[in-house]
Amino acid sequence: MSTEIGHLRRRLVEFLIQSTTLLELPPIVKYSALSLFFDRFRPNLVRFLQKKKAEHWLLQPLNESNLQLFVLISIWISCKMHCTRGLSVHSLKSFGDKVITEQLFMVRDFLDAELVFLKVLKFEIGTLNIAYTRLEDLLIQFKEVAKVGEQLNFEACMDMMDLLYEKEDTSLLYQSSKSLAASILVSSYIITVPKQQYEFPILPWVKMVTNKEEREVVELVEYILAHVLYSNSP
């Protein structure tokens, strides 16, 4: 089962990102949903299915359509936490009818799926310390101390975060959100800030505000940039 989900990982990541874009949801919803589904729901699902009480038709079989349903549930839960006006279950169901093409789910299925999702997570849905929120905080601090921070492209940061979720090995970086946020900030600095303006000592500054060793950050930056450049190559 884990292998099957792994095989679908890239498509599910793209499905989640496209769904949040079509729904015009803010980035915090997207990254909270990515964290809920890929960092928590998926890893805990195997253990959950090993329990007899875990039997549920939405999990048996666990095909792509059912997984897409749970992806929408992760977005729904994230939206409830971060949006002033959350999605209604009827709005979500209507959206699901458009984007899940292989199966039609009823409103009751969405409500059942939400409960199953929460049970798999043991109702632990906090997202305050995900890499995205740490990155936002770092960028705010960076702009306060360095004028060049205004030139750092936050869209590039988000593009890198999206790419890192596509593969199992790179997504493991999200287990250390502080290190990842610092490394993505430095990576975006290298890519988007004009070289002639590299006057700010960004590595010593990152070390000061995150307590992360420069060597650790440099190694992660090299790994991230290699992955990003490889992913964008023909």
Swiss-Prot record:
InterPro entries assigned to the protein according to its UniProt record, in alphabetical order: Cyclin-like_sf, Cyclin_N
Keywords in alphabetical order: Cell cycle, Cell division, Cyclin
Single GO biological process annotation from the record: cell division
Disulfide bridges in this chain: none
Keyword Cell division: yes
Pfam families: Cyclin_N
Family the entry assigns: Belongs to the cyclin family.
Protein name: Cyclin-J18
Naturally occurring in which organism (per UniProt): Arabidopsis thaliana
Gene: CYCJ18
